[in-house]
Amino acid sequence: MRKRSRKVKNDLVVLESKEKKVGMWGIFALILIVFGFIIAPLLPGIFDNAHSSGLKFGSYKGQPIYYKKDSKFAKYVNYYSNLYSRLQGNAKNINTDYNAWYLAFMKYVEDVAFLDLVKKYNFYISKEMLNKNLLKSPEYLDSSGNFSSKRYNKASDYQKVKIYDDMVENILFSNVKIFLNSNLIFPDSLFDMIKNMSTVERHISYLSLSYQDFSNKEVISYAEKNLNLFKRLSLASIRFKNMNDARTAHDKLLNKTPFEELAKLYSDDIANFKGVVSLDKYYFDLDLNVEKKEDLNSIFSLREGEFSKPIKIKNKNEYQIYKAFSNVHDFDKNSDRDISSVKNYIETYEPSVIEGYLENKLSDFLGDVKFSSLSQVLEKYQLSLKEEIVNLSYNINVYPNTLKELVEFNNSKSFYDIIFGLKENSWSKPFVANKKVYLFFLNSVKKRSNQLKDEIKNEKILDNFNIANSGLITDFLLNKKDFVNNFNESFFALQNFSQN
């Protein structure tokens, strides 16, 4: 009896223990379910931010702009950014970020529009065509440019799917472009007009003034009106990466530590290890680098041998201490060096001053021509006329351009507007372009022989249209009502100048 009761008791203990284990596992399972279905989906939003899930691309009204990593848009941004970097180099006044982002956005919009067309017209690709193109995918090619099964097998399933999807999309988009081009049907009258345009010529004379024609007298006059900008001082400086180092160095200078010794200790400038190098600096030079105007004025109040307090560099958390190796020199109108520095300043920061002067000079020339012979006025202003032949090859490369020295204007709508807006034996207004100011005179309107016209084939015109209209496809898809206007704007030369 005791054995039975002990067994029952033991069984109850085991059962209770099992129930406890089941209860604990049940609670654990419940926690996992709650975590998996409720909390986990929220975690990316809780812990992730734009820095970890996307790429920063500039800002708008102080708010950062982010876009998804590895997306097609990101690929376009990267492509156009690299392209701008190569083309522009270190060119100033070019917002590379904005231009790259804008072009990437337009390309992305074009892709969306193409995709809609693909769906609307049920475009498809044959398996044979797709496989043929996949075999040429760069990811699968060896160093000789041949398909490599080894490289194919090395690619992950994810990579293969991505390559496949990209290939399908690219081929479909190519087919859409062919579809659009084949549906842009041009009337024969358009081809005839382009052929007739090949015979149109404008024979012009022109003269020009460049920045080099901005006289020293004008340079001196500008400097004397802005004397403060062109004060000059011989300076050496030590750059510090933080304010603490700058203060420590300044205290040492106050305690008679030689400036040269501190330069060797703190400066990253290798030249300072050979001794302090002093350079002549103009007020406008330092105005570009010093953050506060009062600091700038304090530098130009230094006497020879004196040093400044730590001065913050503009747009950086760095500081400089300057030492004067001369007293301040005012602008000297007899100094070629000072005159050259002022002229360089005006060319760089105030080009409108030069252009305004040159425009006024050519306007005076036009005024004198009304009352004197052309040869006399040319001699008075020490100018000479050059000649050019202008034809209508703007934006349409179906026949050769006739421009020579003015070839830089071969795609300038403003230039063509002026030339084809002139009447025979009349002068244009001053025209500013490329650091020069021009005057154009229309000698005559002539027609070339029909030989060139007869050599132009419709197929060549169509080929050029298909190339040139690629930029109009988006407009065609998104703004059909504006297509005609956009077309005429892009093909400026299609205006019927032959009737003028």
Swiss-Prot record:
A molecular function GO annotation: peptidyl-prolyl cis-trans isomerase activity
InterPro entries found in the cross-reference section: PPIase_dom_sf
Subcellular location, record wording: Membrane
UniProt KW Transmembrane keyword: yes
GO cellular component: membrane
Membrane topology field: Single-pass membrane protein
Keywords: Membrane, Transmembrane, Transmembrane helix
Membrane spanning residue stretches: 27-47
Protein name: Uncharacterized protein BB_0039
Species per Swiss-Prot/TrEMBL record: Borreliella burgdorferi (strain ATCC 35210 / DSM 4680 / CIP 102532 / B31) (Borrelia burgdorferi)
